[in-house]
C-alpha cells in the first residue's frame, strides 16, 4: 500500500528534486555528473536572477554548482525542466561553505540577470549560431540585434554581447569561392549591400568595419563581449585595419592595399597582434590567426581535444567562472576560425583552454578598457565537422554538453558580483 510519504518521494524523483526536506532553505543545483540537465540549470539560475532572487555560483564545487533560495517557483521550474535540484538545510549549507573555505573553491554572489544581445541577421535560423541554440534551450532571454541597431547606438542597452560567424572584414567569409551562384549567397550579398547603402556606406566592408568599431567602443566603455567562430578573428582584423583596405576587390571593387599588413594598427585590437592577412581571393582564410585553417587544403589541421585550465577560484575568480565544467578535457570542433595561434596572442590574453603540445589555443579571455572580451574558437561544440546545410543540433540530446557549458558560463559571468583580486 502506498502512503502519502511514498507519493512525496516518487514525485520528488519524477521532477528532479532529491532529498526533499520540509525545512530546506536552499536548492543546491549540482553541475557534476549528478546533474540531469546541465544546460537548463543555467536557465534556472537566470530565471531566479530575473525575478530579483540572488544566487551563488560555487566555483569548483561539484562542477560549478549553483546555490539558490528554496522557493516554490524554482522547485516547479526545476521539476518541469528535469533539472537536478537538492533541497538543502542550513546545516548542510554551512558544511558546504566550510568545505569551500578549505579548498580551491569559492562562492560567488550572482546579483542581477544580465541584459543579453546577440548580433545576428534578422532572418537567420537559430541553428546558424550555437549561442542562440543554447540560450533558447536553457530558457535565457536575449534580444537579436544587427547592423542597424548597432549603428543607432543600441549596444548601450546591454551588458553582454555575443557575436558568432559574422565576417567583419566584409568579405562574407569568402563564400564566393564555392557558393557565388547559390540563391542563399546571392540573397546574402544583396541584403548586406542594401543595408550598407541605407546606412550611408559605399560597400559591405565599410559597413562591417563601422560596426566593428562600435563593438570595440562597447567593450572599452565596460561591455562584456563573447565571440565564437569567424567573428573572433575578423573583428580583430577589422579593428586593426581601420582606414586600411583589407578586403579583396570581389567585396568592395578595389584591390587590397599591397602594404596592408604593415599598416595594421594592433594597438587598437583586443586579443591579437602581429598577424598576417591572407590577401589571396582564392584562399578561403582571413589571416594566420587561426591554427586549423579548415577551408584551406594543405593547411587544414586535424581535430584533437582541448584542456581547460584549473584556475584558483579565490585568486582568479573570473577565469575560474569561465571554465566551470564537469569535464576538464573536451573534444575539439571546427569552425571558420577553430583556434588561435599562440604567436598571435597579445601578452595580456589569458588562455582558458589549450590543446596539449599544439601551437594554438581554443579559448581566451582578457580586459579591454573598462570591459572584457572572451573568444571561443569553433562553430558548434556538438557538430565537430560543421558544414553549411547541416541540420540544427538538438540540445535535448546533449543536455550535459561540456562544450556548450562554456558558452553558458559566459552568459552568467556578467551577473557575478566582482571581488577584488587577492594580490
Language-model segments: residues:
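Glycine- and acidic-residue-rich phosphate-binding/metal-coordinating active-site segment common to enzymes
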Residues: 245-252, 258-263
Amino acid at each position: 500500500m502506498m502512503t502519502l510519504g511514498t507519493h512525496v518521494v516518487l514525485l520528488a524523483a519524477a521532477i528532479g528534486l532529491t532529498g526533499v526536506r520540509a525545512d530546506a532553505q536552499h536548492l543546491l543545483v549540482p553541475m557534476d555528473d549528478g546533474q540531469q540537465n546541465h544546460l537548463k540549470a543555467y536557465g534556472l539560475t537566470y530565471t531566479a536572477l530575473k525575478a530579483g532572487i540572488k544566487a551563488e555560483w560555487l566555483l569548483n564545487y561539484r562542477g560549478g554548482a549553483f546555490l539558490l533560495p528554496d522557493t516554490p517557483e524554482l522547485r516547479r521550474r526545476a521539476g518541469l525542466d528535469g533539472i537536478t535540484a537538492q533541497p538543502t538545510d542550513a546545516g548542510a549549507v554551512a558544511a558546504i561553505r566550510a568545505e569551500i573555505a578549505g579548498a580551491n573553491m569559492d562562492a560567488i554572489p550572482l546579483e542581477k540577470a544580465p541584459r543579453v544581445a546577440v548580433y545576428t541577421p534578422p532572418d537567420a535560423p537559430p541553428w546558424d549560431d550555437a549561442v542562440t541554440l543554447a540560450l533558447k534551450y536553457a530558457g535565457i532571454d536575449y534580444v537579436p540585434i544587427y547592423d542597424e541597431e548597432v549603428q543607432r547606438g543600441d549596444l548601450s542597452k546591454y551588458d553582454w554581447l555575443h557575436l558568432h560567424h559574422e565576417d567583419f572584414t566584409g568579405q562574407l567569409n569568402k563564400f564566393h569561392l564555392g557558393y557565388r551562384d547559390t540563391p542563399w549567397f546571392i540573397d546574402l550579398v544583396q541584403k548586406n549591400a542594401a543595408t550598407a547603402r541605407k546606412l550611408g556606406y559605399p560597400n559591405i566592408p565599410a559597413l562591417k568595419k563601422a560596426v566593428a568599431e562600435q563593438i570595440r567602443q562597447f567593450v572599452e566603455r565596460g561591455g562584456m563581449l563573447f565571440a565564437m567562430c569567424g567573428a573572433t578573428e575578423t573583428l580583430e582584423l577589422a579593428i586593426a585595419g581601420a582606414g586600411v583596405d583589407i578586403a579583396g576587390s570581389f567585396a568592395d571593387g578595389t584591390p587590397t592595399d599591397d602594404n596592408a599588413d604593415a599598416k595594421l594598427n594592433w594597438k587598437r585590437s583586443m586579443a591579437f597582434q602581429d598577424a598576417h592577412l591572407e590577401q589571396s581571393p582564392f584562399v578561403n582564410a582571413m589571416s594566420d590567426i587561426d591554427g586549423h585553417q579548415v577551408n584551406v587544403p594543405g593547411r587544414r589541421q586535424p581535430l584533437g581535444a582541448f584542456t581547460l585550465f584549473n584556475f584558483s577560484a579565490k585568486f582568479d575568480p573570473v577565469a575560474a567562472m569561465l571554465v566551470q565544467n564537469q569535464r576538464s578535457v573536451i573534444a575539439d570542433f571546427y569552425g571558420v576560425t577553430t583556434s588561435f595561434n599562440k604567436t598571435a596572442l597579445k601578452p595580456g590574453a589569458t588562455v582558458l583552454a589549450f590543446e596539449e603540445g599544439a601551437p594554438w589555443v581554443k579559448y581566451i579571455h582578457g580586459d579591454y578598457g573598462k570591459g572584457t572580451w572572451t573568444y571561443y574558437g569553433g562553430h558548434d561544440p556538438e557538430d565537430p565537422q560543421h558544414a553549411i546545410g547541416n541540420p540544427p543540433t538538438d540540445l535535448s540530446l546533449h543536455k550535459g554538453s561540456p562544450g556548450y557549458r562554456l558558452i553558458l558560463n559566459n552568459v552568467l559571468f556578467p551577473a557575478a558580483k566582482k571581488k577584488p583580486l587577492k594580490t
